[in-house]
Amino acid sequence: MNNSAINYQGYYKYFFILGMLLFSFGLNWSMFLVSLSIIIMAASLIVKIEITKPFVSIYTKWGYDFKLLFKDPIYLILIFVFLVNLISGLWSEEKPLWIWFTRMMLPFLFLPMVMIRIGTVPRKWIHGFWLLCISSIFFTSIWILFDYIQHSQEINEFIMKGGAVKTPISHIRYSIIIACSILILMQWIVKNEVFEKKFERWIYIFLFIYFIIFIHIISVKSGIIGLYIGLFIYWTFYLLKNKKMIQWLAMIATLFILSIAAYNLVPSLKSKVAYTVWQYSEWQKGKWLYYSDIERLVSIQMGLQIVKNFPISGTGIGDIEQVTKDTYYECLNHKEIKYAHNQFIFSWAACGLLGLLSIF
């Protein structure tokens, strides 16, 4: 390459940074931006550009990357998830829906490319990426918390009727993102590996405590249960590995005390628990319609019925909506549907045994 060539290192970092910015912003607002950001980051890591006037040369290392895919099962598993959904289109009659689901699964195809090349990305960039995500989540949480404080009575009553705290995206997805942020912050605090300034540690401790309080305020069961399971697994591995049995027992007691304290101190969580207990009593009376948790359980029952009817191949991802409608109508004489609220059952029902295998 002659002296007029420009090193790609000066270009790819800007695309990678763009991808990180889109991901951190889209995490709270748009799944499309999340998918697009992964594609951009993947492209920035596997494409090499050389500008040699008057030509622009583009090179890729896909052949080399293809060989690397076989060195780590996680890469193949992610690609397998995408391929299973893609292949199920062969027996799907509703092609538009199949295309939609396939497009949503594209990140599983590109993510391994990012993971293969992520080692070439400076560590501070990765740290900065997670900081961007957590900062974005923090700012949206401030808006949610401010709204809750202003309308706490109305929101608590709304939760008692099966509603949820208003969030910019699905409240279930949002709460899980909060739980993951808490676990990332905890890792930074415990390992003390990523701090460049002394005051950073105190910022992470503040955010850790703040998000723990916040996740109980928004009172979404998926996020709270996921958080407690994550905390239990993390500290179980960390403490038992170092043979600290007393501290492990203290950790269990701490989680128990935290849950009891949150129930008694956070009105929204108390309302959520009360509503959950009440709707199960209604279910015992044979009522299920318009009760959020019970509707999810019914959706799982309908999903299992679909699995029973299509145990090997599934319906095909494109036909899952129509088959679900037919199943609801046949079993419950009801036209409003929900997809099976369990990823294992949904994947099995839509893509058959291969779909079930792909997420194990």
What are the roles of these predicted feature ranges?
Residues 28-36, 100-104, 165-181, 222, ...:
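Membrane-interface micro-motifs in multi-pass membrane enzymes
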Residues 75-81, 95-118, 127-137, 141, ...:
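Aromatic-anchored transmembrane helix interface
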Residues 286-301, 305, 309-351:
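Long extracytoplasmic/lumenal interhelical loops at the membrane interface
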Residues 217, 238-286, 301-309, 317:
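A membrane-periplasm/extracellular boundary helix in multi-pass inner-membrane enzymes
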Residues 86, 126-157, 169-241, 259-265:
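Alpha-helical transmembrane segments of multi-pass inner-membrane proteins
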Residues 232, 236, 350-360:
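Hydrophobic transmembrane alpha-helices and their immediate junctions
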Residues 40-44, 108-114, 175-188:
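Hydrophobic cores of alpha-helical transmembrane segments in multi-pass inner/ER membrane proteins
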Residues 1-90, 117-127, 131, 188-202, ...:
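Transmembrane signal-anchor hairpin modules in multi-pass inner-membrane enzymes, especially those
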